[in-house]
């Protein structure tokens, strides 16, 4: 039986203590029955130590949760807006429980950055907090010693630790025996209905079952609709106390500005970024968009940095600190700048393209205005957003066919198989394979052991109906973002209603409630500058250096490093499919069902410009990647775009006055497989299927070992290029220099 209560928040002007509690002058009274008790007095004293404010008091609902944990030993779910102070609940409860003789609190959190911040925050209140995660392995022994000596009040671990065999066998049993409070941070990750589902979180349900019934459990999240809340409640067990607060953010002023194209959107940023309040975040949908936008703004004199999944961890931490210290105007970021980043005075969030779900959007805009009375939030949607959502839409659930293949491969192996070795037996890329293994592990079909994974031989039934419903829910979320852009009603009310907030109401501040608050003009010089950035073409196409492991199992006689005499040189690509500039035109060309036609003259000229710059070289590499000007051009035949490839090769040949020797030949029916398979299977699918024919071999002999330019339309795994380059080199070509129109990703 679920005890479901709604706690309405106090919406007040809050200071830098907003993440923990409110100033006494603005706080709501503590719940009846709590104020005046010994627990309340003790909890309030700890809160004030935590925030360093002798006048601080609880936000509405905070003490109710603390009391449920400390006095009631309850299993409690807190769903409250960002900045409400969920961490204050578990830090205060932890210290009170420790004073009553309980063991240390175990906090499961997916966020390394948040762990750093929380350890520092806990220390301010005398809470001895330590962490075990992938970033501090050198400290693990010290942490174990501190735990053994009972010198730790709070231990933070990543969910991945719970699946580590050594941790599970050597540390977890003792932790379970001694734990005084279990905290599940970002609990929406536990639900496969959630926008950020992580299979490792499903291990927590097993952990909860192993805890003594007297140990309280707290789950916290800011982003959960009713379906996700119900899923979390089921996994917490019976008798859950759910405290749901209002999700509306009075400090945020929302708006949507629809502009004709990417050039205008970037031009708007160039024109108006300096007028936005304080410092903030500009979110983009792709890595290339973040990097291009940051470069454009920096060249115009704005203090900005890019922040993506490709950013070095040390550079990420530095960028976060610069933003916190207001040393930059903005970070131009992908969703890599995610949960756990906290800057109470963040002045604005601008989205250059819409996230694919209202939940993700709410979470990202919720980083603004946590400790300020006002913050601006503006969405600049793009016509290409849905295409990008679709491009990145990867199934977070296992397909029945792939799951069966993994289970069969592990059962046949008999012993543990590493993920790398499994790639040679199952056609799945590393990331989806690891995700599938985690799902199967949580369901008990496989287990992670020393040396890799092995089958438990327990029966496993594929829940096709559930996975289909989840896939449909993802599409509904995308549709909701389109509705958000087009709605004439209050934008905050719409977002919070989608999150099933029963208290959703008109904010009176957004562009639909109070009128357009943002300028819509774009300076002509800014538009021109943006256009120049978008028209830039050319990126490095890195060559494969090593063959995948286990190729002998697939009948391909290669292993280890690719031999230099057979290797492809570094190449060039016009653009990635996700680029803001040429990416749009390329996505149209390669869209499903798109007609094959000769290369557009403007695209051909852009490729020629890329070649000129490649031939000149730069400080990093010599011209033509050190291979010398190509003496001939060869193309890879395309079954779907033959006119495109042939016209591109002939056009470059005519303009560059480089002989076009023709195309390679497809043998045995040509490459097999489809985009998305893993590296080993992709290589096996092209091996010996792209060959040098007799006429081409004779023509290659005539250039006497000089370099060859290799033309292709689309690069994904790069194994077709690698095999084609190897064949050309074995036939007598010197360096093989690939030029590709588009690269996936």
Residues of each region from the PLM?
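Arginine/glycine-rich "motif VI" loop of SF2 helicases in the C-terminal RecA-like domain
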Residues: 367-374, 655-656, 729-733
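C-terminal accessory region of SF2 helicases/translocases
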Residues: 328, 350, 354-363, 369-570
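Helicase motor core with emphasis on the C-terminal RecA-like subdomain
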Residues: 36-41, 45-50, 60, 64-89, ...
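Active-site-facing substrate-recognition patch
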Residues: 252, 531-632, 642, 646, ...
């Amino acid at each position: 039986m679920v005890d479901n209560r709604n706690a309405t928040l106090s919406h007040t002007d809050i200071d830098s203590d907003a993440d923990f509690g409110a100033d006494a002058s603005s706080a709501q009274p503590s719940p009846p029955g709590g104020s005046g008790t010994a627990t309340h007095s003790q909890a309030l004293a700890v809160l004030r130590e935590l925030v360093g404010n002798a006048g601080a008091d609880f936000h509405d609902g905070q003490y109710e949760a603390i009391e449920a944990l400390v006095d009631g030993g309850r299993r409690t779910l807190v769903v409250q807006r960002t900045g409400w102070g969920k961490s204050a609940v578990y830090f205060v409860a932890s210290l009170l429980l420790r004073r009553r003789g309980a063991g240390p609190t175990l906090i499961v959190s997916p966020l390394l950055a948040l762990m750093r911040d929380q350890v520092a925050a806990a220390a301010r209140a005398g809470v001895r907090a330590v962490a075990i995660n992938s970033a501090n392995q050198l400290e693990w022994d010290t942490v174990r010693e501190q735990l053994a000596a009972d010198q730790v009040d709070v231990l933070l671990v990543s969910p991945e630790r719970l699946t580590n065999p050594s941790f599970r066998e050597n540390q977890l049993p003792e932790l379970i025996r001694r734990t005084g409070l279990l905290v599940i941070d970002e609990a929406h990750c536990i639900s496969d209905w959630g926008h950020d589902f992580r299979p490792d979180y499903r291990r927590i349900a097993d952990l909860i079952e192993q805890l003594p019934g007297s140990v309280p459990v707290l789950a916290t999240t800011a982003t959960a609709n009713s379906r996700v809340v119900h899923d979390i409640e089921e996994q917490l067990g019976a008798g859950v106390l759910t405290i749901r607060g209002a999700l509306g953010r009075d400090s945020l002023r929302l708006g949507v500005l629809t502009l004709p194209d990417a050039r205008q959107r970037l031009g708007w940023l160039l024109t108006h970024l300096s007028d936005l309040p304080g410092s903030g975040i500009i979110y983009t949908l792709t890595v290339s968009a973040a990097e291009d936008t940051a470069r454009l703004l920096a060249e115009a004199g704005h203090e900005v940095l890019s922040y993506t999944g490709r950013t070095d961890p040390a550079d990420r931490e530095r960028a976060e600190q610069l933003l916190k210290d207001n040393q930059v105007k903005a970070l131009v970021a992908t969703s890599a700048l995610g949960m756990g980043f906290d800057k109470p005075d963040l002045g604005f969030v601008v989205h250059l393209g819409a996230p694919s779900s209202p939940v993700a959007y709410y979470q990202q805009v919720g980083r603004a205005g946590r400790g300020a009375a006002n913050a601006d939030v503006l969405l600049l949607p793009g016509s290409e957003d849905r295409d990008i959502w679709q491009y990145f839409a990867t199934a977070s659930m296992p397909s029945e066919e792939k799951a069966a293949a993994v289970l069969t491969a592990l059962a046949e192996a008999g012993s543990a198989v590493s993920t790398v070795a499994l790639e040679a037996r199952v056609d799945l890329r590393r990331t989806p394979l690891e995700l599938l293994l985690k799902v199967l592990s949580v369901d008990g079909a496989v287990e992670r052991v020393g040396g890799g994974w092995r089958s438990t031989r327990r029966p496993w039934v594929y829940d096709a109906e559930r996975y289909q419903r989840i896939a449909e829910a993802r599409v509904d979320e995308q549709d909701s973002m389109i509705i958000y852009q087009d709605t004439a009603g209050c934008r905050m009310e719409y977002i919070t209603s989608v999150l099933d907030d029963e208290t959703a109401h008109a904010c009176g501040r957004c562009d639909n409630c109070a009128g357009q608050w943002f300028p819509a003009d774009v300076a002509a010089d800014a538009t021109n500058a943006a256009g120049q950035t978008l028209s830039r073409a050319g990126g490095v196409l890195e060559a494969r250096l090593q063959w995948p492991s286990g190729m002998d199992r697939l009948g391909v006689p290669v292993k280890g490093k690719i031999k230099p005499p057979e290797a492809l040189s570094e190449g060039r690509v016009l653009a990635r499919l996700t680029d803001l500039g040429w990416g749009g035109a390329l996505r149209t060309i390669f869209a499903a069902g798109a007609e094959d036609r000769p290369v557009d003259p403007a695209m051909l000229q852009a490729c020629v410009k890329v070649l000129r710059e490649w031939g000149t070289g730069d400080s990093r590499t010599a011209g033509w990647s050190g291979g010398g000007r190509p003496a001939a051009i060869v193309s890879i035949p395309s079954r779907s775009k033959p006119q495109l490839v042939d016209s591109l090769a002939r056009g470059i040949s005519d303009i560059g006055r480089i002989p076009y020797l023709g195309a390679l030949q497809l043998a045995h029916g040509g490459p097999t497989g489809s985009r998305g398979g893993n590296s080993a299977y992709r290589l096996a699918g092209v091996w010996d299927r792209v060959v040098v024919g007799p006429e081409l071999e004779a023509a290659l002999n005539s250039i006497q070992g000089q370099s060859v330019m290799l033309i292709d339309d689309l690069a994904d795994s790069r194994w077709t290029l690698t095999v084609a380059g190897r064949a050309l080199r074995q036939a007598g070509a010197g360096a093989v220099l690939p030029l590709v129109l588009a690269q996936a990703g």
